[in-house]
């Protein structure tokens, strides 16, 4: 579960290393974001020469959460860290590579480019 002020790792090669969630998109009273949900975030740490800089406000999609999520078949999925992928124009990722596994929920929410770039879909 991701909410305001949550810090997330960045799972792509845009140059950002850490994000701070500012807002969960999808309704004025929406408090939590899970895998496949879009958030507005600020870049808190970035490497020099990256496509995003520290302080940039970006949209990102959550790809991994520490909080377990129950699936329709009764199984649960959880990861070791909270991570997100920065989005560019539309729902396409800004980076060209994705690091680490991503949740299968991204396919259901039509983030096909992220699913195809990811090394593993769990």
From Swiss-Prot:
It holds the Pfam family Ribosomal_L14. InterPro entries: Ribosomal_uL14 (IPR000218), Ribosomal_uL14_bac-type (IPR005745), Ribosomal_uL14_CS (IPR019972), Ribosomal_uL14_sf (IPR036853). GO terms for cellular component: cytosolic large ribosomal subunit. It comes from the Bacteria. Keywords: Ribonucleoprotein, Ribosomal protein, RNA-binding, rRNA-binding. The keyword Ribosomal protein applies. Part of the 50S ribosomal subunit. Forms a cluster with proteins L3 and L19. In the 70S ribosome, L14 and L19 interact and together make contacts with the 16S rRNA in bridges B5 and B8. Belongs to the universal ribosomal protein uL14 family. Binds to 23S rRNA. Forms part of two intersubunit bridges in the 70S ribosome. This is Large ribosomal subunit protein uL14. It comes from Bifidobacterium animalis subsp. lactis (strain AD011).
């Amino acid at each position: 579960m991701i909410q305001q002020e949550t810090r997330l790792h960045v799972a792509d090669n845009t140059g950002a290393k850490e994000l701070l969630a500012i807002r969960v998109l999808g309704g004025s009273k929406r408090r939590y974001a899970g895998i496949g949900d879009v958030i507005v975030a600020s870049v808190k740490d970035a490497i020099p020469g990256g496509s995003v800089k520290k302080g940039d406000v970006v949209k990102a999609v959550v790809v991994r959460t520490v909080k377990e999520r129950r699936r329709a078949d009764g199984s649960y999925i959880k990861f070791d860290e909270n991570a997100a992928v920065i989005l560019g124009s539309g729902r396409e990722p800004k980076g060209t590579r994705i690091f680490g596994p991503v949740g299968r929920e991204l396919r259901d929410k039509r983030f096909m480019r992220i699913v195809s770039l990811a090394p593993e879909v769990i």
